[in-house]
């Protein structure tokens, strides 16, 4: 799976090529063989909060695939207050890392934080997020209860991600889940030009440090 946008930056960067295991959550119509099955999935295993998942866009499932992080499972109440994430009334912890920057963006902006919340197994899950702008569009959202058989997704680049906070997506039904992103196989050094178009830096074509990089 090729990362087409910076919505999961800094975890995943534009130009990363990611290995996805399509058996992680059972099989459905979006799985490798696209075979007709009884119901929407077989051998379903629910993703855990914190998993990075590839899924089909419910509007155009055959044309567009998305990759985001699971922050809500069925029954969870999701809320965002002043950019802080709350799951079932508990605020996800944030620890400051440093100023945000990426070669996919023209300017350094915002800050990186280590975000921690509890997964279904009771263990804490940690990942880095990018909070770029004060009072951004989705800095306040909900509360929203995740419906049965649905998942709530958010991008790690919180102010530059169209995800379940958007009215055009909201929670995604499990039938659209394709698989779990496991690691970056290799990474092309894609930079964003002043008009926001992606350009491959042929003078320095690869991000060698991202080869075989695990995704957490």
Residue ranges of predicted features:
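Aromatic-capped interface at the extracytoplasmic side
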Residues: 1-8
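Soluble "head" domains of membrane/secretory-pathway proteins
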Residues: 10-216
């Amino acid at each position: 799976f090729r990362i087409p946008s910076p919505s999961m930056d800094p975890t995943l960067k534009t130009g990363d090529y990611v290995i996805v295991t399509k058996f992680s959550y059972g099989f459905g119509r979006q799985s490798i063989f696209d075979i007709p099955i009884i119901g929407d999935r077989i051998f379903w295993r629910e993703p855990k909060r914190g998993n990075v998942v590839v899924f089909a866009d419910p509007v155009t499932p055959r044309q567009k695939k998305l990759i985001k992080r699971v922050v809500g499972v069925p029954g969870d109440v999701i809320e965002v207050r002043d950019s802080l994430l709350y799951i079932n009334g508990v605020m996800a912890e944030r620890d400051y890392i440093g100023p945000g920057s990426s070669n996919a963006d023209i300017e350094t902006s915002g800050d990186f934080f280590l975000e921690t919340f509890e997964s279904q197994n009771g263990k804490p899950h940690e990942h880095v997020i990018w909070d770029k702008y004060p009072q951004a569009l989705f800095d306040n959202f909900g509360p929203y209860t995740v419906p049965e058989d649905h998942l709530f997704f958010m991008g790690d680049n919180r102010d530059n991600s169209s995800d379940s906070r958007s009215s055009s997506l909201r929670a995604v039904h499990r039938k659209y889940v394709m698989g779990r992103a496991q690691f970056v196989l290799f990474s092309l050094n894609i930079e964003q030009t002043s008009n926001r178009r992606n350009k491959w830096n042929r003078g320095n074509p690869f991000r060698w440090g991202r080869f075989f990089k695990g995704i957490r």
